[in-house]
């Protein structure tokens, strides 16, 4: 478990390893044959139906597992920047930033997307330019934003583009589109919409944030996240500092400009270049924060927005991490109850407290004496073991795999938990990492001030984290220390997003979601002036496309007919 900041993160050391395993696997997909792997346009492979980034990674979760303004008064029908100065909503982060020059932004809105073959059947790719700094759009410094689409399949009248974001922050929208959304969303939706996604600035195919190479990342993800003495505490702090220094050395130009507000501005640029007057969007996990930020900045350009697995933007970093810690405990309780009923449960019988105590004892043992994992440079210690467990808690379809991996680890074979952790970190077999963890930290640390001022502040907060989760609390608290040493000062802060004047926005919450607690969905739906809450009473992270006919029907009707479900509807 090694970290990243607060928002939608993953802990260093959590992974998903294939169809019907961790992350975002549609529940029904587990009952039908699927190809073993899909090759996306970056050359990275994904298991079909597996969203490797819909995990909400907050400062603590990423570490722990290891832890625009262009509203225009113009006649341009696509919301091109006009002569009037941008006036952001009062609740938006952008309020304190200089208003961008509309004339300087116009060339960006006038560019054309040139579509080319991606090398992935059915998909096209393109690249758009966006200003590095929206406060200085005429400076000549730009970033590349990679885009992909699959055109509407028909039959039926085309409704425009549907932009999807899998979460993160740091998740590759293009990888998600090509491996899942573009082929796995309901056929009726794909028939009427061009399915579109992009890698946000800082992510993979777009101008990326880079921090550490593979061997250094291997070391980083093994750092003990529950320091037992001053030496281990110093080692953890040093790891955070080394990670931050690597990001500054390799990506210093980009780091100040990868906030969620920047990404929302890029999304409005994309909307215009796609030829859409309104943005139609489905965002999961952290993608709900991106979508809500967009709506708050551009309420008049909101089309049909679905925010699934919602975040509460009013929660400061400390509370986000503590809430998520509580969410993982809720998910673990559900796993523990199920495990105790299974004949192959390696944690024995009894209630969640007894099962949790045995898991905690296992973590203590591998902390003192790591077990073999098949990789001599990465034995399974507490950090990687914890990440592997947390990764599997994102989806109940991964519980059988988790039981098997725990059983093997308790008998001296840590390869199963290591595989889960590697999947969470998006580590390939050749030792290379996707840049998800780098982008995750960069976005989270920019969006909010750090959760803690230093190790002493963690000490103060530990009791509340351990109360939230006796098993995972300490590690997730220490993981949230990551942003304390970030080289760039945060530009955002916790705030209410209201999107005053926007069309109806559907907010989806799952009652036992481990990564985005249900109360966050309730809060966001209440903040958004036009928000309507759709509830799934169940387990797992996010709800759409994961096996609930009730949820899918409500969202499909909204996307296809524009009819939002009744506020408070439960499935």
Residue ranges and their predicted role:
Residues 3, 7, 44, 51-61, ...:
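Catalytic-loop region of hydrolases
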Residues 507-512:
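Conserved strand-to-loop "acid loop" that flanks and positions the catalytic carboxylate
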């Amino acid at each position: 478990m090694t970290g990243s900041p607060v928002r939608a993160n993953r802990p260093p050391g959590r992974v998903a390893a294939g169809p019907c395993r961790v992350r975002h696997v549609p529940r029904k997909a587990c009952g039908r044959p699927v190809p073993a792997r899909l090759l996306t346009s970056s050359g990275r492979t994904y298991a079909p139906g597996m969203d490797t980034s819909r995990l909400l990674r907050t400062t603590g979760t990423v570490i722990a597992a290891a832890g625009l303004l262009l509203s225009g008064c113009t006649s341009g029908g696509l919301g091109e920047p006009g002569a009037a100065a941008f006036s952001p909503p009062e609740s938006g982060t952008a309020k304190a930033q200089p208003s961008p020059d509309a004339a300087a932004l116009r060339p960006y809105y006038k560019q054309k997307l040139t579509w080319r073959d991606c090398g992935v059947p059915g998909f096209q790719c393109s690249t758009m330019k966006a200003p590095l700094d929206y406060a200085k759009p005429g400076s000549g410094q730009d970033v590349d934003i990679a885009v992909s689409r699959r055109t509407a399949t028909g039959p039926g009248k085309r409704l425009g583009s549907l932009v999807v974001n899998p979460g993160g922050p740091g998740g590759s929208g293009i990888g998600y589109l090509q491996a899942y959304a573009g082929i796995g969303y309901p056929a009726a939706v794909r028939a009427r919409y061009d399915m579109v996604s992009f890698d946000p600035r800082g992510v993979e195919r777009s101008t990326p944030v880079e921090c550490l190479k593979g061997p250094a990342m291997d070391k980083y993800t093994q750092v003990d996240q529950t320091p037992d003495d001053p030496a281990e505490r110093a080692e953890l702090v040093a790891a955070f500092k080394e990670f931050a220094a690597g990001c500054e050395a390799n990506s210093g130009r980009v780091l100040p400009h990868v906030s969620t507000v920047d990404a929302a501005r890029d999304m409005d640029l994309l909307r215009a270049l796609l030829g859409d007057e309104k943005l139609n969007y489905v965002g999961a996990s952290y993608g709900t924060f991106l979508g809500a930020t967009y709506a708050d900045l551009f309420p008049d350009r909101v089309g049909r927005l679905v925010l699934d697995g919602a975040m509460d933007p009013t929660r400061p970093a400390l509370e986000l991490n503590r809430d998520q810690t509580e969410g993982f405990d809720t998910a673990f309780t559900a796993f523990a109850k199920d495990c105790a009923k299974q004949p192959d449960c390696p944690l024995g019988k009894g209630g969640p407290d007894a099962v949790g105590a045995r898991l905690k004892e296992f973590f203590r043992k591998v902390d003192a004496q790591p077990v073999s994992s098949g990789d001599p440079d990465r034995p399974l210690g507490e950090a990687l073991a914890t990440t592997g467990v947390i990764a599997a808690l994102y989806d109940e379809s991964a519980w059988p795999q988790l039981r098997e991996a725990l059983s093997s680890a308790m008998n001296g074979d840590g390869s199963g938990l290591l595989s889960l952790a590697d999947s969470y970190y998006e580590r390939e077999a050749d030792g290379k990492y996707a840049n998800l963890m780098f982008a995750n930290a960069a976005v989270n640390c920019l969006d909010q001030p750090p959760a803690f001022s230093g190790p002493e502040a963690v000490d103060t907060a530990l009791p509340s984290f351990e109360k939230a989760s006796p098993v995972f609390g300490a590690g997730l608290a220490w993981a949230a220390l990551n942003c304390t040493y970030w080289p760039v000062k945060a530009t955002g802060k916790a705030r209410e997003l209201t999107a005053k004047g926007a069309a109806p926005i559907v907010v989806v919450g799952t009652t036992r979601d481990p990564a985005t607690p249900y109360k966050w969905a309730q809060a966001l739906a209440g903040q958004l002036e036009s928000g309507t809450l759709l509830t799934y009473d169940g387990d797992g992270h996010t709800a759409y496309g994961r096996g609930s006919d009730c949820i899918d029907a409500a969202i499909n009707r909204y996307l296809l007919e524009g009819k939002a479900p009744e506020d408070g509807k439960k499935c």
